[in-house]
């Protein structure tokens, strides 16, 4: 029994040992291998798709760059077209203005021509016959009121008979009425005011064509009428003068009186009569007229005493019996002989053809060489400017209701009001929201966007976008300051600078801030102040990204990055970034000589080393020598530190 028991134990042990042996690993199935192959194929498909997409993106990028280039070219062409349209518009405006002026002058000439035709029909004016012009053109010879007037001295006037005095009065009155009939607002000549009887009006109604003859007192000899005088003048001249046949058409005779150009129709005359030294021969008039003019009238040609009409008797050359001379025509250039195609303007001396001379001389009709200093009007040399100045002195100067500025003329106030009223600025800038009152200001403003500076200073090379800026700059080179303050005597190179300076004396601050109670003298100061309320800082540093309110603050800040030191000390040679720092240095270190803080050798210090790239400049001006810091990047105007 004892031997039989161990046998089952050994069997159990062998079974346990066999159960404890490790099981064999399972072999991978074929399905897993197929899955791996499929995943690899899918990965290569995705890579190929990504590469195809990248190629498409690259193609689209190239097309986009090409389109951007074409867009830039189109924008340049569009800008060029806009510039051309603007230039054409300006030229068209100028042409329209010239056309309007020509139409006005044409209407004025038409009215004068109608008046002259009425004048000739009334026969109440002395008419000088002029030769026909080349190609039938109209000649012009200037003649004033005095050219057809005769003045007597006091002894000569007393020797005249009553009928001779009456004849003289009627002739002078006829000349004056002729000027009045041509719409000339002229004062009555002194000769008429003194010879006119008391109780008689200065001007009388003009006689009609039937009543145009000059009445004379009865005397032993028959009276002389205007028709008789015209009959003498209209007679044909002697053939020995060699004049060409007279033109049947009337010629225009251009004269001046009180600086107003006057067109008078006249009939043809021999060319020799235009010479200031050769008298004009006429056929002998009747005996009464012969005695009146040869014995009395032409005696005054040698008299130099004052006439009873307040005028000196001019020296006239002697004329033989039956001849009349017009010496005052000698002060004007005469038309050239027949055959010459060039004519000279007696106003400016230009040489023009005869058909162009008429149009050219119309431009002189509006010339007024004497401008009024207080208003845009111009006056002729004969006009009395003293009365106009007195009128300005008694007037209240026009004042702007918005800024209280005063102006010398209402038209300038009207133009100034456009500054306050933005709706009256019809010219907007296409590059910014600004608007302007006229095209010239818009053109000047657009040069700032285009960085165009066409006006260059010949002395220093600086360029300017405005011509007035160049002129003011050149006054600085010439030390010219023509505008002086009457209160403190300080001189300025421009009128606008003087006006801004005078606001200091008057306390005027026409630009108030709507957000606070502050007011400013200049508009740009108000704009800079408004940025404090809005938080706007439009000027950014390209190196560190710091933003500033004003442009000159940015320029000062950039000296830190560039190492620029534009303010050298004349004593020790040290240079400073800011002008205020140089002033502080001069006050502290130089009292008649170089201070202890300067280089004893008197040589300028070594140039600054490389800039510190990691310098923190947010809000503070850093002193690299450890002296102090100063907040100047904001609104303050103090200088920075070395």
Swiss-Prot record:
Keyword terms, alphabetized: Activator, DNA-binding, Isopeptide bond, Metal-binding, Nucleus, Repeat, Transcription, Transcription regulation, Ubl conjugation, Zinc, Zinc-finger
Keyword Transcription regulation annotated: yes
Single GO molecular function: RNA polymerase II transcription regulatory region sequence-specific DNA binding
Location of cross-link Glycyl lysine isopeptide (Lys-Gly) (interchain with G-Cter in SUMO2): 265
Gene Ontology CC: one annotated term: nucleus
CDD domains named among the record's database cross-references: KRAB_A-box (cd07765)
Stretches annotated zinc finger (C2H2-type): 343-364, 370-392, 398-420, 427-449, 455-477, 483-505, 511-533, 539-561, 567-590
Inducing factors: By estrogen receptor alpha.
Residue ranges occupied by any KRAB domain in the UniProt entry: 143-214
Chain spans, region Disordered: 1-24, 198-225, 587-615
Highest taxon of source: Eukaryota
Function: Functions as a transcriptional activator.
Family that this chain belongs to: Belongs to the krueppel C2H2-type zinc-finger protein family.
The protein's name: Zinc finger protein 398
Lineage: Eukaryota, Metazoa, Chordata, Craniata, Vertebrata
Gene: ZNF398
């Amino acid at each position: 029994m004892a031997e039989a028991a161990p046998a089952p134990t050994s069997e159990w042990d062998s079974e346990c040992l066999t159960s404890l042996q490790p099981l064999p690993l399972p072999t991978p199935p074929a399905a897993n291998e197929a899955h791996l192959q499929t995943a690899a194929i899918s990965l290569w498909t995705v890579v190929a798709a990504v590469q195809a997409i990248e190629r498409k993106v690259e193609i689209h990028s190239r097309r986009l760059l090409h389109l951007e280039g074409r867009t830039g070219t189109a924008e340049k062409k569009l800008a060029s077209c806009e510039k051309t349209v603007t230039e054409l518009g300006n030229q068209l405006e100028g042409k329209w203005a010239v056309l309007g002026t020509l139409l006005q002058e044409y209407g004025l000439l038409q009215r004068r021509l109608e008046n002259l035709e009425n004048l000739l029909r009334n026969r109440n004016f002395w008419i000088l016959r002029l030769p026909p012009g080349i190609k039938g053109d109209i000649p012009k010879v200037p003649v004033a009121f005095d050219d057809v007037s005769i003045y007597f001295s006091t002894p000569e006037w007393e020797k005249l008979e009553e009928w001779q005095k009456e004849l003289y009065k009627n002739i002078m009155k006829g000349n004056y009425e002729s000027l009045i009939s041509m719409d000339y607002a002229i004062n009555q000549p002194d000769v008429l005011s003194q010879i006119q009887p008391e109780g008689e009006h200065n001007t009388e109604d003009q006689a009609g064509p039937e009543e145009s003859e000059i009445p004379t007192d009865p005397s032993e000899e028959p009276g002389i009428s205007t028709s008789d005088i015209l009959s003498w003048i209209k007679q044909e001249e002697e053939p020995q003068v060699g004049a060409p046949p007279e033109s049947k058409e009337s010629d225009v005779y251009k004269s001046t009186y009180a600086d107003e150009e006057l067109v008078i129709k006249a009939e043809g005359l021999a060319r020799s009569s235009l010479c200031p030294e050769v008298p004009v021969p006429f056929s002998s008039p009747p005996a009464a007229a012969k005695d009146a003019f040869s014995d009395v009238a032409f005696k005054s040609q040698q008299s130099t005493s004052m006439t009873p009409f307040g005028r000196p008797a001019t020296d006239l050359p002697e004329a033989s019996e039956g001849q009349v001379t017009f010496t005052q025509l000698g002060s004007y250039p005469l038309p050239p002989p027949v055959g010459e195609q060039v004519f000279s303007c007696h106003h400016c001396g230009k040489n023009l053809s005869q058909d162009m001379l008429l149009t050219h001389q119309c431009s002189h009709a509006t010339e007024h060489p004497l401008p009024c200093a207080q208003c845009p009007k111009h006056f002729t040399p004969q006009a009395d400017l003293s009365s106009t100045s007195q009128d300005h002195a008694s007037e209240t100067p026009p004042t702007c209701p918005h800024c209280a500025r005063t102006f010398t003329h209402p038209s300038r106030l009207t133009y100034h009001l456009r500054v306050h009223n933005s709706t009256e600025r019809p010219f907007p800038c296409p590059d910014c929201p600004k608007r302007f009152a006229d095209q010239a200001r818009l053109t000047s403003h657009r040069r700032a966007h285009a960085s165009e500076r066409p006006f260059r200073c010949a002395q220093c090379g600086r360029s300017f976008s405005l011509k007035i800026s160049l002129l003011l700059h050149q006054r600085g080179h010439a030390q010219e300051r023509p505008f002086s303050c009457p209160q403190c005597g300080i001189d300025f190179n421009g009128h606008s600078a003087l006006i801004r300076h005078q606001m200091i004396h008057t306390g005027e601050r026409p630009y108030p801030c709507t957000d606070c109670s502050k007011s400013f003298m200049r508009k740009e100061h108000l704009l800079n102040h408004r940025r404090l309320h809005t938080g706007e800082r439009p000027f950014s540093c390209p190196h560190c990204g710091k933003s500033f309110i004003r442009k000159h603050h940015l320029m000062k800040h950039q000296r830190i990055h560039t190492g620029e030191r534009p303010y050298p000390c004349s004593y020790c040679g040290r240079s400073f970034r800011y002008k205020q720092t140089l002033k502080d240095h001069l006050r502290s270190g130089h009292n008649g000589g170089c201070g202890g803080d300067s280089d004893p050798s008197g040589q300028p210090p070594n140039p600054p080393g490389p800039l510190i790239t990691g310098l923190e400049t947010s809000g503070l001006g850093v002193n690299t020598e450890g002296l102090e810091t100063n907040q100047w990047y904001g609104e303050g105007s103090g200088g920075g530190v070395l």
